[in-house]
Amino acid sequence: DSDNERDMIAFLLSDEANNFKRWKNEFKELFLGDRILMIYVSAIVNYSRANDIDLMILRKKERHSKVNGVIAEKQKVLPKKIHLIELSQDEFLKNLEEKQKSIINIVKTAIILYGQSKYVELIKNVKSI
C-alpha cells in the first residue's frame, strides 16, 4: 500500500538525518511548522573542506521573518558562510518539472533534516528527474 511505502521512506529519511545530529541541532530553529529543511553538498560530506553550509527551506506560503534573524545569529558563531535557498513548495516542484540541474542535484544529495513526511508527500507525484 502506498501510504505504508511513503511512511517507510519518511522513516528512512529521518533515520538518515539522525546521522547528522550536529546539523539538526544547529538549525532546528528554522523548522517552522509546514517547512522542509535540507542540508546538502560539501558540509555533509567533508565539513573541514567545505566552503560554506548549504541549506534549503521549502515552505508552503510566504517567507517567515524569523528565518533571516536565525541565519544572522548562526552566521555570527559558525566559521563557514551559510548559503540559504528558500523556495515555496510550488517553486520547488516547478524547478523539478523544468529539470533545473541545480535543484535536481540538491534532491540527489540532500539530507532532509526536518519535514521528512512533508517532503515525501511533496515529491510523490514527480514523474522523473
Residues of each region from the PLM?
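Catalytic core of pol beta-like nucleotidyltransferases
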Residues: 1-35, 45-50, 59-129
